[in-house]
UniProtKB/Swiss-Prot annotation:
Keyword line: Cytoplasm, Cytoplasmic vesicle, ER-Golgi transport, Golgi apparatus, Membrane, Protein transport, Repeat, Transport
Primary residence: cytoplasm
Any Gene Ontology biological process: intracellular protein transport
Subunit structure: Oligomeric complex that consists of at least the alpha, beta, beta', gamma, delta, epsilon and zeta subunits.
Topology relative to the membrane: Peripheral membrane protein
Protein name: Coatomer subunit beta
């Protein structure tokens, strides 16, 4: 710390355009001015002293003319003045004038006004001169007996601070405060006194607690919090004391203060692993979540429950509380509900899954009865996914869940309906006994489906799993009902012509007969080429989709019709019925092809859809055994393989999670005997208070030992050269929302450098919080300068600047050393994250910013390149490992990450290895990045480009 910093620890901005007052004018105002003028003058004196001015001539003036005043504002300002003014001579001896000031302190400590007494006591806590405090000790002791609690609690603080700094001034402080604590009634005074005993004489604090341990519940919350802290520290240092105080912690779980309950529950978990203790703490957490209105509090406490679940023995206890945890679903916040459902799903077992499903079904029904809202739709999706997972893990529950969920296939919210469809598809494949039920329910809701995407999926399921004549006939009936009158073109033209009034039937051009590809005649007029606007709600669903130009559903329908027709032929032996059914299926396909080629739809049919429908027509016309196997066996096997791979992937990830959580004990691990263990080694748990303090200070200890590159030295950036007059290097410490630059500045010359200033500026979404203050560097001296930079979003930022200084005694202009740029790494703010394929596709469609990066590397292996990109970008690969295994010369993978600011980043890697260039040919291709903000997309692209260049060196 420099000499300037030693005195000037607070900087107050002074307007540059104002003239600084002279010492003479200030002295005149302090001597002859009224109270208002003296107040203003005293403020100016304080600011000048804080900014480094000495003003020794004003000390006696203030003692003579300002100190005797009884004005409260002046007394407040005087306390600040006495705190900052130099009180000693250069050789360290107390100034003679301070004896007069000491007498003024004593009078204020005996002042009838309790505020003046209390504020003086608070001021005495900041004094570091024992000679000033010694004469005041009797007055400070007397304040412990004052009638007002404000004076008493500040007297306790003053005694504690003096005892800690100068124990010889009041050696009996612990005994004095203990006696005071026994007789005190005010909660804040008791809290301060008890806090002092904890730090000054812990044994006395424990003795006091032992005498009143049964009355702890009646204490104020501020004292209860201190008691919890004491019990934790004592039991952490000396585990044998746990039995003595654990009952007190149990009692504090019933406190009226949420803060006390939270701390008591956390302490109880660290002190005891008994099932009763864990259950009591968990129950306390659940009550807090339900009763607290702040969603942030709910999420914090939910995180504590999740931490409890990570311990295998605690998890078994929490499984009995699943139904209590589900009470949290009454909270309207989506994030809280999401975390609650995930926790309940992790804890559910065969004992309580039935009750869980009943509650979730009720919640699903509730979402129908509330006003539609974006969060309601998302909550419904969460419930569907949770029920889906329950049914897969506990197949017996599927029969209860399916009827409720099938109703949502006709929901207006396509996302929720898609989740239901995914669940139904998996259930009908896995559970053979449920197929008749699912097909029956699917046929019931089929006509009410509003989304073309859901309609396609439902068609596929019906075509794949209808195995009886009756079901096949029912599917055909539903398709005919959904398609309406056929042929579609003729019926639509008639319908439109019939809806027109006689005076509106004006033919723009001559009516002509056209021969279609099928060899039939189609009448076309101006009416069919420009249709009038009309209501479309009365159209059957499938007909509406086709007229809107969505012929992809027609291709799906053709496949379904082919499957059920081939299956019908195998079930029914009568040739006439076989031919009739096949002819009906072919007629439907033909009429759709006819519609697609006409001008009635909003968009014409695509060539791909024409090819698909034509192929199905050909299959039905030939009915070969090979095509029969492909349509009725191979398709189902493909689904089976996909679901098996998905299940295997989930099991593998669960296994990895459980392996992380399970702490295995090795055969050669040492056995700990309590009687033979030193006190400081007794508890294996870390001190939670110390950890929370470190976290608050931004000193969270990361596991850096395993990776030497993650050490602090790796984050040191050289800012100037070794030959520059001033050498500078910076350690870049990245916190969540800000960056701290710790800059080492070294004077490499033989001159004294005055007004040495670090001037910084930023590019990107960075903001310099405050300008570093100038300093003076002696020859070959060094100093550390800290600068804070605020970060607002995930974007590559650059910090640049220079160091300017004056050389002592030189008449030249200011000297300047330009600093190297500091690049802020986007990777410090990006974390791997997961999302479903549907969510990925939805975000991909919504995000408007795309950055396409061309692959330019010397890596020759596709998998190696993908792993390199994952490591460089901190993203997670969503594509299953099995889909990436093997070698076929090309690879496609989806990557996802989320920033600490809640921004999503998507990437699609599409790479190949050109075989014609030989085995040593590098990987080629491109990476497409999508994000909501331009900065995120560009920054991630820059990072990938940079990492590729490093690889190719």
């Amino acid at each position: 710390m420099t000499a300037a910093e030693n005195v000037c620890y607070t900087l107050i901005n002074v307007p540059m355009d104002s003239e600084p007052p002279s010492e003479i004018s200030l002295k005149n105002d302090l001597e002859k001015g009224d109270v208002k003028l003296k107040t203003e003058a005293l403020k100016k004196v304080i600011i000048m002293i804080l900014n480094g001015e000495k003003l020794p001539g004003l000390l006696m003036t203030i003692i003579r003319f300002v100190l005797p005043l009884q004005d409260h504002t002046i007394k407040k300002l005087l306390l600040v003045f006495w705190e900052i003014v130099p009180k000693t001579t250069p050789d360290g001896r107390l100034l003679q004038e301070m004896i007069l000031v000491c007498d003024a302190y004593r009078k204020d400590l005996q002042h009838p006004n309790e505020f003046i007494r209390g504020s003086t006591l608070r001021f005495l806590c900041k004094l570091k001169e024992a000679e000033l405090l010694e004469p005041l000790m009797p007055a400070i002791r007397a304040c412990l007996e004052h009638r007002h609690s404000y004076v008493r609690r500040n007297a306790v603080l003053a005694i504690y601070t003096i005892y800690r700094n100068f124990e010889h001034l009041i050696p009996d402080a612990p005994e004095l405060i203990h006696d005071f604590l026994v007789n005190e009634k005010d909660a804040s005074c008791k809290r301060n006194a008890f806090m002092m005993l904890i730090h000054a004489d812990q044994d006395r604090a424990l003795d006091y607690l032992s005498t009143c341990i049964d009355q702890v519940q009646t204490f104020g919350d501020i004292l209860q919090l201190v008691i919890v802290e004491l019990i934790y520290k004592v039991c952490h240092a000396n585990p044998s004391e746990r039995a003595r105080f654990i009952r007190c912690i149990y009692n504090l779980l019933q406190s009226s203060s949420p803060a006390v309950k939270y701390e008591a529950a956390g302490t109880l978990v660290t002190l005891s692993s008994a099932p009763t203790a864990i259950k009591a703490a968990a129950q306390c957490y659940i009550d807090l979540i339900i009763k607290e209105s702040d969603n942030n509090v709910k999420l914090i406490v939910l995180d504590r429950l999740v931490e409890l679940k990570e311990h295998p023995s605690h998890e078994r206890v929490l499984q009995d509380l699943v139904m209590d945890i589900l009470r949290v679903l009454s909270t309207p916040d989506l994030e809280v509900r999401k975390k609650t459902l995930q926790l309940a799903l992790d804890l559910v077992s065969s004992r309580n899954v039935e009750e869980l499903v009943i509650v979730l079904k009720k919640e699903v029904i509730k979402t129908n009865n509330v006003t539609e809202h974006e969060d309601t739709d998302k909550y419904r999706q969460l419930l569907v996914r949770t029920l889906h997972s329950c049914s897969v893990r506990f197949p017996d529950m599927a029969a209860n869940v399916i009827p409720v969920l099938m109703e949502f296939l006709s929901d207006n919210n396509e996302a929720a309906a898609a989740d239901v469809l995914e669940f139904v598809r998996e259930a009908i494949q896995r559970f053979d006994n449920l197929r008749p039920l699912i097909v029956e329910k699917m046929l019931e809701v089929f006509h009410a489906i509003k989304s073309v995407k859901i309609y396609r999926g439902a068609l596929w399921i019906l075509g794949e799993y209808c195995s009886t004549k009756e079901d096949i006939q029912s599917v055909m009936t539903e398709v005919r009902r959904s398609l309406g009158e056929i042929p579609i073109v003729e019926s639509e033209i008639k319908k439109e012509a019939g809806e027109l009034k006689p005076e509106e039937e004006v033919t723009v051009g001559p009516v002509q007969k056209l021969v279609t590809e099928m060899g039939t005649y189609a009448t076309q007029s101006a009416l069919s080429s420009s249709r009038p606007t009309k209501k479309e709600e009365d159209r059957p669903p499938l007909r509406g989709f086709l007229l809107d130009g969505d012929f992809f559903v027609a291709a799906s329908l053709a496949t379904t019709l082919t499957k059920i027709a081939l299956r019908y032929v195998s079930l029914v032996q009568e040739k006439k019925k076989q031919n009739s059914f096949i002819a009906e299926a072919m007629l439907l396909m033909a009429t759709i092809l006819h519609l697609g080629k006409s001008s009635l739809p909003k968009k014409p049919i695509t060539d791909d859809d024409v090819d698909r429908i034509s192929l199905c027509l050909k299959v039905l016309s030939e009915c070969s055994p090979l095509m029969n196997d492909i349509f009725n066996k191979e398709c189902r096997q493909s689904l089976s393989h996909m679901l098996s791979a998905k299940l295997e992937e989930e099991k593998l990830s669960q296994k990895k999670e459980s392996e992380k959580r399970n702490v295995t004990v090795q055969p050669d691990d040492p056995i700990s005997f309590m009687q033979l263990t030193a006190k400081n080694e007794m508890s294996s748990k870390e001190d939670q208070f110390q950890l929370s303090l470190l976290a608050a200070m931004g000193n969270t200890q990361r596991k850096e030992a395993a990776d030497p590159l993650a050490s602090k030295l790796n984050k040191v950036t050289q800012l100037t050269g070794f030959s520059d007059p001033v050498y500078a290097e910076a350690y870049v410490h990245v916190n969540q929302y800000d960056i701290v630059l710790d800059v080492l500045v070294v004077n490499q010359t033989s001159d004294t450098l005055q007004n040495c200033t670090l001037e910084l500026a930023t590019l990107g979404d960075l903001k310099l919080v405050e300008k570093p203050s100038p300093l003076t560097l002696a020859p070959h001296d060094f100093a550390n300068i800290k600068a804070n930079v605020k970060v607002a979003s995930t974007e590559n930022g650059i910090i640049f600047g220079n160091i300017v200084y004056d050389v002592s005694g030189a008449a030249s202009d200011r000297n300047c050393v330009v600093l190297s740029d500091i690049h802020i790494d986007i990777m410090d703010y990006i974390q791997p994250a997961s999302c479903t394929d549907a969510e990925f596709r939805q975000m991909w469609a919504e995000f408007e910013w795309e950055n396409k990066v061309t692959v330019n590397t010397n890596i020759i292996d596709l998998n190696e390149y993908l792993q390199h990109i994952l490591k460089s970008t901190n993203m997670k690969c969503l594509t299953p490992e099995k889909a990436l295994s093997g070698y076929c010369g090309f690879m496609a993978a989806n990557l996802y990450a989320r920033s600490i600011f809640g921004e999503d980043a998507l990437a699609n890697v599409s790479i190949e290895k050109p075989i014609h260039l030989g085995p040593e040919a590098p990987v080629t291709g491109h990476i497409r990045i999508r994000a909501k903000s331009q900065g995120m997309a560009l920054s991630l692209g820059d990072k990938i480009n940079l990492s590729q260049k490093k690889t190719s060196l």
